[in-house]
Amino acid sequence: MAVISETSDEGSNGGAANKKPQEEEENIPPIPKELPEELIVIIVALVRRYHYPKLSLISKAYRDLISSPELFQTRSRLGFTEPVLYTSIGFPPFDLPSWYILHRISLQFKQITSLPSMLPGSAVVTIDYKMYVLGGFIGLNQPVSTMIVIDCRFHTYRELPSMQRDRGGAAAGVIDGKIYVIGGCKKRYNDWVEVFDVENESWETVPGPYPNVASESVEFSQYAVMEQKIYILDPLFCLTYEPRKRRFEAWGRRSQQRRYESCCVVNDMLCTVDSTCSHGYPIVVYDPKGMVWRPVKGVQSSDLPNLVYYESRMANFGGKLVILGGNQSRDRKDSYLEKDIWCIEIALEKREDGDIWGHVESRSVVLSSSKWPLIALSRSVTV
């Protein structure tokens, strides 16, 4: 790039006496009026996500960019994606469940009014920045086949093709980029298992054989994906389903697994809360090889708030175990009035000797209410 310097009329700077500044300026490459699209995507990807709503107000071009898959892919490639925690909380008997998002700075749940209430018995799975909500019950336990997808970047949703069968209390999991849904209807149906192609947005029936040990009318309480298998808690038995081999396996009676009302997978470990501390610790991890539950050492009951753990919900939050649970806090008059929802974040580590150790990194009240909350579920997405 040429540099324009001041010159005297006599050319005393040693340059050509007759060369004018305008001639040197012609050597400067023109500044592009528009930045390359690839550079714009990278620049916006570097901006913190909470600024996106304001950016989207600038112009339609920004709105299109912020909603584009290219921006998410660029953020993922640059390592700028972040986990976001969602939960569905109701206040029975009058208030239907609403979606809430955890704000990382204030550590408070904020209600999302733009999303519909999640039906009781819905199955929910996540893929990147999307949550898929399948089935559920309406009225007097009438199952439905509906399916919606929630875009967690903008808290919008749209309907997807319905399942082939009405389902309530089904299990679901994402394997190889496809959504498998199991049960939630009579087992005698040939479409007891269905698979949803996310790219083509189409359903297909997955043929049997189906497990003989599962209940005839199945409503699963919990499910999670680990080692390319869907782990399912049946009312009577614990099952795994391996879609690649189309194979079901039983891994013990549920009575032997005690009452584990919530579970999630963190770092390929199936975690749950054992409120009875039958293993000496309140958190346990399932060992699929030994088919036994093992304690998470280092986390004592005294490290955790006094919560109603059989109504708690768990999630994998950026590689950490998160537990959401409610308790009642006393006011100054020592009467039970305010109900709190706590968020506990626990780091897990599997050591060389096979022991699992945990450390409570944070515990805080994230929502308070005069009504008793019912936490329907907790999920983490990447945005």
UniProtKB/Swiss-Prot annotation:
SMART domains: Kelch. Pfam families: F-box, Kelch_FKB95. Residues 29-75 form the F-box domain. InterPro entries: F-box/kelch-repeat_ARATH, F-box_dom, Kelch-typ_b-propeller, Kelch_1. Keywords: Kelch repeat, Repeat. Residues 1-30 are annotated as: Disordered. SUPFAM superfamilies: Kelch motif (SSF117281). CDD domains: F-box_AtAFR-like. Kelch repeats lie at residues 130-177, 178-223, 262-313, 320-371. This is Putative F-box/kelch-repeat protein At2g29810. It comes from Arabidopsis thaliana.
